[in-house]
């Protein structure tokens, strides 16, 4: 049996903003990437991993997506993307998209609706919790970007969870309607012809229902959310569902960013018989200083 194509592929990451500027405005763009395909082909690469090009307020360099099916105007148009895809494929180069579905931008229409009222149809697309009696955050979790992982929204006087910036509310993967919309969006890109996805923070999409205070490390103000958000109880269920609904229908390369995951756990995401992802970015082996605790995952 022939190995999957991606097992022998050479992947080259392109960060569009700084790669090649075709129109002289000082910002790299999709036309710039297309103009350098011959150069990339000469390098001998097989795959371009394209960092986020979706519409975004750019709070986190495009990892805060406000429209999953639109191109950030400073990078060009959807026609520019289609031309890049066509020209890359003509040269035997595949395109893998960066995909961010642990969270969205707070300017995404889902969140704009979600925050309007407690009974809004999109309310449960995100993770909301009541304040404590004194009005403080539901627990002591800290954000990866500093400060609390909770943001009070005055519209309904409830907090929403954001493991990253306050402008990046976490999506509620427990909601099947949210998952349906994510799979529909992924299918749209696959039908367009993309060759896979690199999935940002995919090990964090399943949070535990119980959200107690996290352990506070010496010298830190906030608690560790890891035991309650990384490798949550349904993460493999969701990825198997994603595989069945979308990934298995196409010839794709899928890479999961799995920070906080042990080598043993990583094999569950990308094992031959896991029916989840092709491979993962696994970080434990580069934690030379031993500053990250993985004990809760063993």
Residue spans for each PLM region:
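Acidic/aromatic-lined carbohydrate-recognition and catalytic surfaces
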Residues: 2-187, 191, 204-261
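Hydrophobic residues within beta-strands of alpha/beta enzymes
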Residues: 48, 197-199
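Substrate-binding cleft/loops of secretory-pathway carbohydrate-active enzymes
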Residues: 105, 114, 255-289
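Conserved small/polar residues in nucleotide/adenosyl-binding loops
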Residues: 295-298
